[in-house]
Amino acid sequence: MIQKAERIIEAYQKVKPAGCGVIAMDGRAAAGKTTLAEELAVTLGGAVVHMDDFFLPPALRTLERRSEPGGNVHYERFLTEVIPKLASGNPFSYRRFDCSRMSLGEEILVKNNGFVFVEGAYSCHPVFGDYMDRRVFLDIDGKTQEDRIRNRN
């Protein structure tokens, strides 16, 4: 999978300066989004922003919100804390949502000096617009997905 992704990145670099850009990696649960983003960040140089860090806090979990596709994502916070800062090329930080405490936790520093891989379900949600230079959707067959989820928990 990493070789295929590297070919995608190489093709992308032909139209964008080498070593920069925002790649959003969406896809099905357990398809390998986090693993691929982290491997590419190490291989090509870059940072990873995890959509899991933007879970919706309990106070905002209304029935209406939970019925929306992607309603479990605190997209307002992602829209203000991440998207406007991606194009700058400057380091920035945001606070990770800590599911064990159900509140904001540690501050995450994004170096933003190369590729930024935004990975996770709903990273390509329409509410975010076209903040990314490229979108990648990772799919997985049902059996492998089930096996990975069982092994994860």
Model-derived regions: residue spans:
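Extreme N-terminal, non-catalytic leader segments
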Residues: M1-I23
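P-loop (Walker A) phosphate-binding loop of NTP-binding proteins
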Residues: R28
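Conserved lysine of the Walker
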Residues: K33
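Hydrophobic positions on the alpha1 helix immediately C-terminal to the Walker A/P-loop
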Residues: L36
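Active-site signature of alpha/beta-hydrolase-fold catalytic machinery across serine-
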Residues: E39
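Short beta-strand-centered segment that lines the nucleotide-binding/catalytic pocket of NTP-utilizing
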Residues: L44-A59
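Conserved nucleotide-sensing/catalytic segment adjacent to the nucleotide-binding pocket
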Residues: A47, L60-S103, F115
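ATP-dependent NMP and nucleoside kinases share a basic, alpha-helical "lid"
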Residues: S103-R152
